[in-house]
Amino acid sequence: MSMLLYYFASAVKSIQFHVDDDIIDKLNYYYTTAIITVFAILVSAKQYVGFPIQCWVPATFTEPMEQYTENYCWVQNTYFLPLHDYIPHNYAERENRQIGYYQWVPFVLALEALLFYVPTIVWRLLSWQSGIHVQSLVQMACDSRLLDLESRNRALQTIATNVEEALHVKHQVMSGNRLKLLNLIICTRSSGAAVTFLYISVKILYTVNIVGQIFLLNTFLGNRSKWYGLQVLNDLMNGREWEESGHFPRVTLCDFEVKVLGNVHRHTVQCVLMINMFNEKIFLFLWFWYFLLAGATLCSLFYWIYISVVPSRQLNFVGKYLTGIEGYKMVDSQSLRRFVFHFLRQDGVFLLRMVATHAGELPCYELAKTLWNNYCDNKEGKMHDV
């Protein structure tokens, strides 16, 4: 397990920021994944290097018997009873009070970290099918800030040429045995919305993941209340500690049987789960973090749908880089609409937004100006051909 988490941590460390997403995406696939991985390493270190459980055994027990008892209770689960409650004589009732999640905490945390990274894997694998390699083009725009004027203009012209070729590629028919999602992405290339459609789909995937993670957290903890974090905080504010609430109890009970000379002897021992002190803080933090992240991710999804679907938002965004600039003050609204909706289309506007977000306003302005010049040149060329 320790080696597995070591390799997993190395993989997380190798994750790098990309320039084809926004800060909410990074909160999901980078920061949250890193936080959960750190928690998984801390818990696994305590479980597999330290002493996760220690039991109070009868004085007649030898050291090997004590070790056996602790190992057995760790593997077979323990159950919680308030300190002053009587131990039920019915063993079935004891089993109903069992706590069986603490052994699986590192594995569950590793699974959660992996699930948070799945949407960005989907984005990386499928974005190249859209026709526009957003990561490479935006990175080129970022790098152009360090170049001289002539080299920067050549770089921006290269970006503009790639965008034009990708946006105006003819529709290609996919064979029936391809994945439906890939087929849909290729089909949307002809409408210039493939990248936008894929990005919003990934946003939906992030939203579904974080909502599912909240339900997974409550299910894993076996908590009947969906407001686990608020319930724990309320208990702490009212001075109701784990001894009463049973949330991540430090002291539990364990039943086990030992066969001696053909006779079965049943023992009940009291055990200390120090690991639950860490688990309580970790899951309380994650519960609140997940809810905050769910709200931010949902707002980000609605925001991107709004700016991608509402035509006026696209016009206003592109227009601010063309109007008010010397030589572009006379751009009429009809020409702007044709430039945005027939030349750039949704994917072109999406790329400009990413350039503005990661490279800054100046590279975005220069790229928009280059695309506008190319659009005007193409329009004049067609008029001369006629």
Swiss-Prot record:
Sample GO molecular function, one term: gap junction channel activity
Transmembrane segments: 33-53, 103-123, 197-217, 282-302
Domain of life (superkingdom): Eukaryota
PROSITE patterns found in the cross-reference section: PANNEXIN (PS51013)
Disulfide cysteine pairs (residue numbers): none
GO biological process: one example: positive regulation of locomotion
Primary location group: membrane
Membrane topology: Multi-pass membrane protein
Any matching Pfam family: Innexin
Tissue and organ distribution: Expressed in PLM neurons (at protein level). Expressed in the nerve ring.
Keywords: Cell junction, Cell membrane, Gap junction, Ion channel, Ion transport, Membrane, Transmembrane, Transmembrane helix, Transport
Keyword Hydrolase applies: no
Compartments where found: Cell membrane; Cell junction, Gap junction
GO cellular component, one term: cell-cell junction
Role description: Structural component of gap junctions. Plays a role in maintaining gap junction activity to promote locomotion.
Protein family (similarity comment): Belongs to the pannexin family.
Assembly mode: Heterooligomer of unc-7 and unc-9. Interacts with F-actin.
Protein name per the record: Innexin unc-9
Species in which this protein is naturally found: Caenorhabditis elegans
Taxon lineage: Eukaryota, Metazoa, Ecdysozoa, Nematoda, Chromadorea
